[in-house]
Amino acid sequence: MAITMEAIKKLRAMTGAGLADVKKALTEAEGDMDKAKDILRQKGQAIAAKRADRETANGCVLAKVGDGFAAIIALKCETDFVANNADYIKLTQEILDAAVAAKAADLDAVKALTLSNGLSVEASVTERSGVTGEKMELDGYNVVEGEYVCAYNHMGRNGLCTLVQTNKPAAEQAHVICMQVAAMKPVALDEKSVDPKIVEEEYNVAVEKSKQEQVQKAVEAALKKAGINPAHVDSEAHMESNMAKGWITAEDVAKAKEIIATVSAEKAASLNMNMIENIAKGRVNKFYKESCLLNQEFIQDSKMSVKQYLQAADKDLTIVNFKRFTLVAD
C-alpha cells in the first residue's frame, strides 16, 4: 500500500526517527502506525545490544528543582554531535521533568516512568538509540528532598550540574555555593560527613608519606656531606645516565648506594613518631579544608571559608545538603 506523507510526518513526530527509517517501518507494517512504532523500537533495541560495550563519554546533564524535590540526571551517549542535538536535550529534559514530578527515589524508578509518547523512560531511551545509532544510558541520578534547594546547570563539554540545599531561604547565597561546588569538587559537607574509612586512609597515607620524607631528608644530607649531588643518584636510571655523561664515577655510585641503604635503615628505625603523627594530622586537616564544602576557601574571597561567607550573610545560615555530577571524571 502507498505510504502517505501525512503518516510519515505523524510517525516521525511520535518517534523522532529519520525519514528513511520511518518510511521503511511504515512500509513493512503496511501502514499500521502501532506496528511501525514496534519495528522502530525493535531496531533501537538491536542497535543498543550491538553497541553495549561502547563508551558513553558524552551526553546531556540537567538539574531541576520541583515542589520539595530536586534532581540531577544525565543521559549519556557516544558523541557530542548527538549530545548537542535539540531532540536529545528535549528527551533528557522530559525524563528529568517526569522524575521530579514523580519524586522518583532512584534510577530504576525513573526508568519505569511513562513519558508523553506512551513509552517508559527506558523504552524511550532505547528508541532514541535506534534513531541515532549510538549507545545511550541514564546515569548520575542524584536527589535532594526538602525546601530551599538551588540548581545550577553548567552547559559545557563537561556536562556539569549541582544542587545545594540551605536551612532557610537564601537564593543568592545558594546560587553562589552551587558554583563553588561545581568548581571546587567537595566530597563532603563537613568533617563529620566524611566516611571514617576515608579519614583513616588519608591519615595512613599521610603517615607513610611523612616517614618517607624524613628518611629522604636524612639520605640527602648524608649524600651532600659525602660530596655527592642527591639529584645525580636518585634512581638507577639517573646513576647510569650521569655516569655516561661523566658527572659521577662508578665509585661515586657505589658509595651513594651504600649511604642510601645504611642511612635509610638507620633513620627508619629512629623516626620520631610523635612528630610524624603531628605532621600526618596536619595533612588530614588540609584534606578537610580542601574536600569539605563548609571548610573550603570561598572561591570569591580566599580570605574566608564557605562557612564564614554564609555566616556573614546570616549568622544562622548553613548548607544542609549538596549534590554534584559531571560527565568528566574529576
Where do the model's predicted regions map?
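N-terminal assembly/interaction segments in proteins that build large macromolecular machines
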Residues: 2-330
